[in-house]
């Protein structure tokens, strides 16, 4: 492994952590109808737990309404149950051909809970990124011995890994800040 490969691997792992954070934040309700809100839901469908987006489409015709249209009408009851049982606090109404979900405005208490959840997810993301940095630094130590890197080269490589880490932590903070503004805004 070369230093470039180590940097690329570190970036790749940190990018994955950022994507997990994005996915977690997308599942938080902000008071606006957003189809991503339901993407993480699993539906009991013919005995298996299936992601909602594999058996239905979710659209937002207006800022306060989500419409879930299943490709299999028999699955609507199961989808309705999954939405009711989720911790999103949503109440779908079954109109026969689709589920209509009115997104109620967030209460102040719920906003505070969501902001706490955003901060928790952001902290988990930062911790994951720092763990990746630690692993990269451990690999760098081994690599420095293998490649007989000088102390200066090793320090430069450590600084580069720290720069990558700072970049991804800043991105995680930006995602969290944006989500907080969405919730409070």
UniProtKB/Swiss-Prot annotation:
Compartments, as annotated in UniProt: Cytoplasm
Any one of the GO CC terms: cytoplasm
Keywords noted in UniProt: Cytoplasm, Protein biosynthesis
GO molecular function, one term: ribosomal large subunit binding
One Pfam family hit: RRF
Biological processes per GO annotation: translational termination
InterPro entries assigned to the protein according to its UniProt record, in alphabetical order: Ribosome_recyc_fac, Ribosome_recyc_fac_dom, RRF_sf
Annotated family: Belongs to the RRF family.
Job of this protein: Responsible for the release of ribosomes from messenger RNA at the termination of protein biosynthesis. May increase the efficiency of translation by recycling ribosomes from one round of translation to another.
Name this protein carries in UniProt: Ribosome-recycling factor
Gene of this entry: frr
